[in-house]
Amino acid sequence: MMTAVSLTTRPQESVAFEDVAVYFTTKEWAIMVPAERALYRDVMLENYEAVAFVVPPTSKPALVSHLEQGKESCFTQPQGVLSRNDWRAGWIGYLELRRYTYLAKAVLRRIVSKIFRNRQCWEDRRKA
């Protein structure tokens, strides 16, 4: 059974990739094993795709371009981005992003469900 999804809910503020991006210092990056670096890459690219789905970007962040090219090096936190001491605001932004991603996926599931129901109805008519 499908659950109702409200499409009228709007975010109070736009979510940007920088709101959910994580940056490591050179020292932190140096102690990461390859599997951790690969996980970091995958998570950052997934976060970017989710943000881009909800709020289409005007340009691709340098971190994302770097990761897509397969380069493995640390990035320092850009000026104006949340500091680690302000993790709470970043976490709230991340949760908002996940909420809207969930809503978008729910809408897509509903659309796909209707398509399959209509397809079944069409096939039943053709058989009759």
Swiss-Prot record:
Gene3D superfamilies: 6.10.140.140. It holds the Pfam family KRAB. The gene is KRBOX1. One of its GO terms (biological process) is regulation of DNA-templated transcription. InterPro entries: KRAB, KRAB_dom_sf, Krueppel_C2H2_ZnF. Residues 15-86 form the KRAB domain. This is KRAB domain-containing protein 1. The lineage of its organism: Eukaryota, Metazoa, Chordata, Craniata, Vertebrata.
